[in-house]
UniProtKB/Swiss-Prot annotation:
GO annotation, biological process: translation
Primary gene name: yml6
Entry GO MF terms: structural constituent of ribosome
Region (Disordered) location: 113-158
Pfam families reported in the protein's UniProt record: Ribosomal_L4
Quaternary assembly: Component of the mitochondrial large ribosomal subunit (mt-LSU). Mature N.crassa 74S mitochondrial ribosomes consist of a small (37S) and a large (54S) subunit. The 37S small subunit contains a 16S ribosomal RNA (16S mt-rRNA) and 32 different proteins. The 54S large subunit contains a 23S rRNA (23S mt-rRNA) and 42 different proteins.
Record's keyword terms, sorted: Mitochondrion, Ribonucleoprotein, Ribosomal protein
Protein name: Large ribosomal subunit protein uL4m
Keyword Phosphoprotein: no
Cell compartments where the protein resides: Mitochondrion
Length: 325
C-alpha cells in the first residue's frame, strides 16, 4: 500500500513540472492598464476667465427718498419733494414701537381711584360693644375694615402711572412709524388746507337754517360714507386717519358723525399709536414737516463746534413742482 501511494505521488509531481514548463513556453501578453475613475465623483471645473470679475464699486445706501404731494380731494400730483432716509426710510423696529406705545398708554392713565382708610371714615370712634359678656365676637369702632361701611385696608390711592422713556428713543419711534407707513404706500401727503368738500347746495341750506339737525347729520354721514368708499379709504379698507395743522370744520364734523369711516386729528393730538392704528395716514405737507422737526433729537447734536451746531437733514426739498393753470 505504501509503494502504491508513493507511485501516485511521483506521477502527480511529474504532471505539475510538465505544466509549469508549458506555461513558460507561452508568450506573455501586455495588458493595457485603464485608468480607474468613480462614476459619481464630483469634478470641479475651473472658472472661465470671462465669468470672474472684480466688483470695484462700493455699496451706497439710500440717503434720500421721494415724496409726492397731492391735491385734495382730486389726489392729483402737485409736487415731488425729497426727504432724508433717516426720516422716512428707517427699518422696522417693533421693540421701539412697543416701548413708545406703552409709554404713551402709561402717561394717559389718570390714577384717580381713592378709598378711605379707617382714619378717614366719618363717625364716632367709640367701641361698639363690650369686650366680654355679650357672647359675640369682639368688635371695635365702626371705622374698622371688618365692619360694613368701615375703612378699606390697603385700598387704592391717587398715583402716577407714567413711566420714563429716553427722548431720543421716543423720537426714533415716531420716525419709525412714519417710515413703516411710507414703505407700505400708506402715507399720503397733501397740500395745506385739507378739508372735506361738502356740496355747496347743502352748505347753503344748512347755513340758512332750512334743514333740521337730524337731517343735516344724516346727510353728512351718508356723504362721508360715499366719499370714503369711492376712494377705497373707508371702513372696508381699514379706515383712514386725517392729520391737519389746525381744526377744519367740515373735516372734523364729518368724521365725528361718521367715525366708522375714519377720524380727523390735529397735529398736537397725535401719538405714535395713532400712526399705526388705521389703514392709512393722510397728512398735510406742513404738518408732516413739523412732526419730523419736533422728533429728530437723535439727529441733532447739542455740541457746538466753532460756534456752529450740526443741523438735522433737510426737510421737504422740492424737486419738481407742477404748474398751476
Amino acid at each position: 500500500m505504501a509503494g502504491k501511494g508513493l507511485k501516485s505521488l511521483n506521477e502527480a509531481m511529474n504532471a505539475l513540472s510538465i505544466a509549469s514548463k508549458s506555461c513558460r513556453a507561452l508568450p506573455m501578453r501586455q495588458s493595457s492598464i485603464l485608468p480607474c475613475r468613480r462614476s459619481m465623483a464630483s469634478v470641479a471645473t475651473p472658472p472661465a476667465a470671462n465669468i470672474t470679475r472684480s466688483v470695484s464699486e462700493p455699496w451706497q445706501p439710500i440717503t434720500n427718498v421721494p415724496v409726492t404731494v397731492y391735491s385734495f380731494p382730486e389726489l392729483e400730483p402737485r409736487s415731488l419733494e425729497s426727504y432724508s432716509a433717516r426720516h422716512l426710510h428707517l427699518p422696522l423696529r417693533r421693540d421701539i414701537l412697543h416701548l413708545a406705545v406703552i409709554y404713551e398708554g402709561d402717561s394717559t392713565r389718570r390714577g384717580m381711584a381713592s378709598t378711605k382708610t379707617r382714619y378717614e371714615v366719618h363717625g364716632s370712634h367709640k367701641k361698639m360693644s363690650p369686650q366680654k359678656g355679650t357672647g359675640n365676637a369682639r368688635r371695635g369702632t365702626r371705622q374698622s375694615p371688618l365692619m360694613k361701611g368701615g375703612g378699606k385696608t390697603f385700598g387704592p390711592k391717587p398715583r402716577d402711572f407714567s413711566t420714563k422713556l429716553n427722548k431720543k428713543v421716543y423720537d426714533l419711534a415716531w420716525r419709525t412709524a412714519l417710515s413703516y407707513r411710507y414703505k407700505r404706500g400708506e402715507l399720503i401727503v397733501t397740500e395745506d388746507g385739507l378739508d372735506l368738500p361738502l356740496p355747496n347746495d347743502f352748505l347753503w341750506l344748512a347755513g340758512g337754517g332750512k334743514l333740521s339737525r337730524e337731517l343735516e347729520d344724516g346727510y353728512v354721514r351718508k356723504w362721508v360714507h360715499e366719499f370714503m368708499t369711492s376712494l377705497n379709504w373707508g371702513k372696508e379698507a381699514g379706515r383712514t386717519t386725517f392729520i391737519t395743522g389746525d381744526k377744519r370744520p367740515n373735516l372734523f364734523t364729518g368724521f365725528e358723525l361718521a367715525g366708522a369711516e375714519g377720524r380727523a386729528l390735529e397735529l398736537w393730538d397725535v401719538d405714535v399709536k395713532d400712526l399705526l392704528e388705521t389703514g392709512r395716514i393722510v397728512i398735510e405737507r406742513s404738518a408732516l414737516k413739523e412732526m419730523i422737526e419736533d422728533h429728530q433729537s437723535d439727529l441733532v447734536t447739542r455740541v457746538a463746534v466753532q460756534g456752529l451746531r450740526q443741523k438735522g437733514p433737510n426737510l421737504g426739498e422740492v424737486l419738481v413742482r407742477a404748474p398751476r393753470y
